[in-house]
Amino acid sequence: MVHLPLSRSRSGRRAVPDLSRYQQFYEADAADGYSTGSGLSSAAASVASLRRPGVGMGRTQSLTGYGRTRSLGAARPSYLGAPPRTYSMSSQRRANSLRSNNGFGPPAVAAGNTITVKTTETKDLQGRTRTVTRQTVKHINGVRYVETTTTMTMPDGEYPDDFYGFEGDFTAKQTSSGHVYQNARGAPDISDIAEEESLEEYLDARDTAPALRIQLRAPPRVQQQRQLQRQRRLSDTNFPARRSAKSSPARQSSEEPPATTKPHRIRFDETPQIVGIDPPTQKKAPKKQMTEQEMYMHALDAARKKVYGEISQPALEAKQPHRSTMSKRMTLRDEATLAANTPPERSRPAKREVRKKEGHSHHNFLSVLRRDSSPKRHAVQPSERVHNKEKTLEMTPDSSSASSYEEARFEHSDEMYNKALEVAKKKYHLTQENSTRDNGTTECPRTPMTSLMSTNVSSDTAESTLLGTPVYSSNAPFDRSPQPSSGCETGNTTPKSIPRRPSFLDKLVRFSQEKYGYRPRRSISSQGHKAEHEHVFTDDIPPLPDIPLVDPMQVKPKDVPLPTVEPALGPTDVSPARVADPESNIETPRTLAPARSSISSSPRRSSPPQAFQELVPLQSTQSETTGDLADALALGDNSLDLLPGRVSEISPKTSFEHFVLAPEVPETDEKPAAAPAVAAEAPLSNPPSVVVVPSATSSVPAAQGAAPGVAVTEGPSLGGPAAPVRALHATKTAAAPAKKRSFFHKLFKKY
């Protein structure tokens, strides 16, 4: 039930309105900064938004509100009209009234429709505006709309881009204030010249520019009309229809409207305008007719250039087939005979051979293998090729005749050959003088000799052959006759031979021959180089010492006095009956065995051949120490035995420093005993006489180095008669010290 107050008493008390009703209206607009009620009009709401909240909201003492007010600003302006009564029936403030929404006035939400615009400008340090920002805030039906627009100003240098779309042409129009030569007939168009100069750098725009953008074109009918107008304008001019090679495409017609969009490149017409002047043609001088001889000479030169290329005539003739080194070795004729039968162009050596003969490749390993064994000739043929290009004279054909050209060419080659021959002779004599000055000997006449050397001849042998000294092949039979002197026979002075250091090839050949025995060993002396008059060859067998050899099956006669037997260091078990029995004394054959051999790798360290002619016995500082001597006399597998009546080859690499006489015993299957021991020294002049005294037992320990039951004595030291030696056997069935013979020993013994 709604209570409607029909009247109001005028009593002293005042009716206080319910303020709680106003909260629902002021809460929505509190955020916008102004307080308005939904019942106010739109004009009152706009005015209320400009005032602070609470101003003019005081209580009035009259119903109309135009009475006295408690503030100065509470007066209501006249243009606002009379406000509605607060407590009347038609008041919109009262929610419980019947006419609160009667439709009078604007709706309640109309008070929030506002538009606010804010503009912000941004400037740089120079005061120039860079950006302009415009912000628009709209409140429509309680909804807030914010629009922000930012405008950027154009940077410097981009303003000329606005004029790219402007294609108007005003220079070609006839004006009263133009130049005089522009209006004259036949004068060039100034606009075309200016456009040529400005557009030369854009001639390759079609190649470098990116893909074309799609542009709107005029309809075909409009394009046809423009084409007709362009043709009419070209027909009015008096210029030729051609232009020079540097002309650029013409600009578009001035009748075309400027483009609406701003293009980023130059646009060319499909049918460019070409206007130019033909360059003057040069008149060629009339050719002079050539004679038949000149035509022939030109044809000959052209054919020669086509076949041989751009080379001079002397160099062309110098190209001859070169004789290989193998062909020179395989031929049986001498080089002088070949030089006589060979034309001078072919007989002249090549550049590589001349350098080899001059001494550019002395120590080259391949040059030793390729070196020719034939001696040098006195006349060295020079090379016809002239390596200095400045001195090469090119023969130009003479227009007189072909025969004169050929004669001049041959005369020129002969002169070159004679000059080159003189230069080569002078150089050859200077080389010979220098070589004789270095060697300190007089120059000897050199006689050519036929080479007998094979392919593997060393460098020193080849050089001795070139010097005129006969060199004997290592395959030839041995000859003890002295070699002829290599010195000159002018006077009594004999030049001394200079020793030469062996090269790598010499060492290689010597090592292969001496190590593996592919070929007989070369002749070497004790000093390691060839002597002048004496040549000692180690291929032959050295002489053996003068020692009488006895047949092993022969029994020594009883009347020969025997030397006394000296016992060894240890006591031996020898019975006197067996010592006195002369029938049991059987002399064993004597063999020659080396006590110690040293192998040397160099021929200079090898012992001289005179060491083979005498025996050097073993020498010991003390006669009591027989352990080392027994070890020296031990018969091992590597001992060298000289069989009786046979001679075995002694290697030159083995130097025999000591020779001792070792007994030879018959072969048995039992194990051999220890080696004998030597008790005294033997003189160098008399050969020692040795008798072996075997025994079955011996008290000398093996650690002391003494052999069991064997003692060797030697004769006097100064050539006196040898003392009698008696050899005693322990028993007839006792086995003597035996040595297992090798296959070669059995073979030599058989024959």
Swiss-Prot record:
Low complexity bias: start-end ranges: 216-228, 596-609
Keyword Cell membrane: yes
Subcellular location: Cell membrane
GO biological process: DNA recombination; meiotic cell cycle
Keywords of this entry: Cell membrane, DNA recombination, Meiosis, Membrane
Basic and acidic residues bias (residue ranges): 345-356, 384-393
GO cellular component: plasma membrane
Sequence segments annotated as region (Disordered): 54-88, 216-290, 314-410, 431-504, 558-610
Membrane topology annotation: Peripheral membrane protein
Keyword Membrane part of the UniProt annotation: yes
Compositionally skewed regions (Polar residues) per UniProt: 431-496
Predominant subcellular localization, coarse grouping: membrane
Role summary: May be involved in the control of meiotic sister-chromatid recombination.
Protein name in UniProt: Meiotic sister-chromatid recombination protein 3
UniProt source species: Eremothecium gossypii (strain ATCC 10895 / CBS 109.51 / FGSC 9923 / NRRL Y-1056)
Gene: MSC3
